[in-house]
Amino acid sequence: MKPIPQTEAELLQRANQIAGCSFAELAEEANMDVPLDLKRDKGWVGQLLEWHLGAPAGSKPQQDFSELGIELKSIPVSYSGKPLETTFVCVAPLTGVHGLTWETSHVRNKLSRVLWIPVEGEREIPLAERHVGTPLLWSPNDEEEILLKNDWEELMEMIVFGQFDQISARHGVALHLRPKAANSKALTEAYNINGKPIKTLPRGFYLRTQFTAQILQNAFNSLLNEE
């Protein structure tokens, strides 16, 4: 792994250095094998980018670059630059949730400063031939923060009241909640609507593609304005 970057500028410089490179080129330098596809290696792209950017490995409550307060997120995009899938933020707490606030939440911590790295994601492009795009450092503006906060508070209220069967993909404008488990047997503890302990699937917070598409579009527009 490359050394941990000491400044935001150093991290961004590294991200710019790998922009335009193929996964094959990056994997060769990192001495990593390129899988045929991502069905069994969903975290492979993230691990490859972490190696090149110097992120300490592992999924943690704090940001990937905790010393810099920056979270790393790869984002698979289509030929037209639109996100192809929702973006995982963090696991949702299902117990001990009374008294939690947006200001101290893991979601807000993770999204306070994000290094977005678009990557080619069209399935017809062999994994080894996919390329890394231009990086983007982002923090939510006031409008985005309000959207995220409102969604988080609505979803957490449903968790507090044990309304798991009522939470659907329709809830949330920018952020939504959905099961996160490799299989349906991986159950975790929670409380139902009557306050009784139950077992349910772990849930994760995800950013909707419409929200991340707007982030990328805004960045692209600001680049055009600079030119």
Swiss-Prot record:
Q: Which InterPro entries match?
A: DNA_mismatch_repair_MutH (IPR004230), DNA_rep_MutH/RE_typeII_Sau3AI (IPR011337), DNA_rep_MutH/T2_RE_sf (IPR037057), Restrct_endonuc-II-like (IPR011335)
- Does the record carry Nuclease as a key word? yes
A single Gene Ontology MF term assigned here is:
endonuclease activity
Q: Does the record bear GTP-binding in its keywords?
A: no
A biological-process GO annotation: DNA modification
Where found, per UniProt? Cytoplasm
Its recorded name reads: DNA mismatch repair protein MutH
Where is it mainly found? cytoplasm
Q: Which family does it belong to?
A: Belongs to the MutH family.
Q: What keywords does the record list, in alphabetical order?
A: Cytoplasm, DNA damage, DNA repair, Endonuclease, Hydrolase, Nuclease
Give the protein's biological function.
Sequence-specific endonuclease that cleaves unmethylated GATC sequences. It is involved in DNA mismatch repair.
Query: What GO cellular component is one of the record's annotations?
Result: cytoplasm
Organism of derivation: Vibrio vulnificus (strain YJ016)
